[in-house]
């Protein structure tokens, strides 16, 4: 079971894992869901090169709080905080509520699954060999203190006629152990041969 299910959803409320959207709605659920989708797509489009890991949206009675986890927080904040103010205004226009935007820096981006998967996807789009990109990510992760890592690429690898999946795994990865802190992410690389899916599991040792 632990091998198949999404490791983050499987461990919710364990190891401080939480939902990416923290709010409750009754009648206006659809409207708030569309607002969340807009906020995520707008931030991802505006800060493509800021090393975004995750965006957490929390709603209180009269306040919407957005927390952006990034490996390059300075890119998001901008000169004298101008860029983040622009984001705040754009979101406030959409949700018609007071908005708070916080930026959290990631100290070790080499062991963040979302950043690893997006890095591999970017390299594949630049026609770097998929094996080289995967092995480099694995080495960096283990060097920075990751307990174990598994990386998978699926699609027309290297421009092959028949799509296939290749996996690389190093270190420990206890997917059945619920208290083990497992980070997981999925990303897509849009190459000239088609889409290549990249999946990354990282065992973070406390």
UniProtKB/Swiss-Prot annotation:
Q: Which GO terms describe its cellular component?
A: cytosolic small ribosomal subunit
Name the Gene Ontology molecular function terms of this record: mRNA binding; rRNA binding; structural constituent of ribosome
At the top level of its lineage, which domain of life is listed?
Bacteria
Query: What are the disulphide bonds in this sequence?
Result: none
| Gene3D superfamilies xref list | 3.30.300.20, Ribosomal protein S3, C-terminal domain
Q: Which UniProt keywords apply?
A: Ribonucleoprotein, Ribosomal protein, RNA-binding, rRNA-binding
KH type-2 domain location, by residue?
A: 39-107
Q: Name one GO biological process term.
A: translation
Q: CDD domains this protein is in? A: KH-II_30S_S3
PANTHER family (UniProt xref): 30S/40S RIBOSOMAL PROTEIN S3, SMALL RIBOSOMAL SUBUNIT PROTEIN US3C
Give the matching NCBIfam families: rpsC_bact
- Function, in words: Binds the lower part of the 30S subunit head. Binds mRNA in the 70S ribosome, positioning it for translation.
Q: What is known about its subunit structure? A: Part of the 30S ribosomal subunit. Forms a tight complex with proteins S10 and S14.
The family annotation for this protein states: Belongs to the universal ribosomal protein uS3 family.
From the Swiss-Prot or TrEMBL record, give the protein name.
Small ribosomal subunit protein uS3
Q: Which organism is it from?
A: Wolbachia sp. subsp. Brugia malayi (strain TRS)
């Amino acid at each position: 079971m632990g091998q198949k299910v999404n490791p983050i959803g499987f461990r919710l409320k364990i190891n401080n894992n939480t939902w990416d959207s923290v709010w409750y709605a009754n009648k206006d659920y659809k409207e708030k869901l569309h607002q969340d989708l807009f906020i995520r797509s707008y931030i991802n489009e505006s800060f493509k090169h800021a090393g975004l890991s995750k965006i957490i949206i929390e709603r209180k009675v009269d306040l919407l709080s957005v927390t952006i986890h990034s490996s390059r927080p300075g890119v998001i904040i901008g000169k004298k905080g101008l860029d983040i103010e622009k984001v705040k205004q754009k979101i406030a226009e959409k949700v018609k509520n007071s908005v708070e935007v916080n930026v959290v820096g990631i100290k070790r981006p080499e062991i963040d699954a979302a950043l690893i998967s997006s890095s591999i996807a970017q390299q594949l789009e630049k026609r770097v060999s998929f094996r080289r990109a995967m092995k480099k990510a694995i080495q960096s992760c283990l060097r920075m203190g990751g307990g174990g890592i598994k990386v998978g690429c699926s699609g027309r690898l290297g421009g092959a006629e028949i799509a296939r999946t290749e996996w690389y795994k190093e270190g420990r990865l206890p997917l059945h152990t619920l208290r083990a802190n497992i980070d997981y992410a999925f990303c897509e690389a849009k190459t000239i041969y088609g889409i290549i899916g990249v999946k990354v599991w990282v065992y973070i040792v406390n």
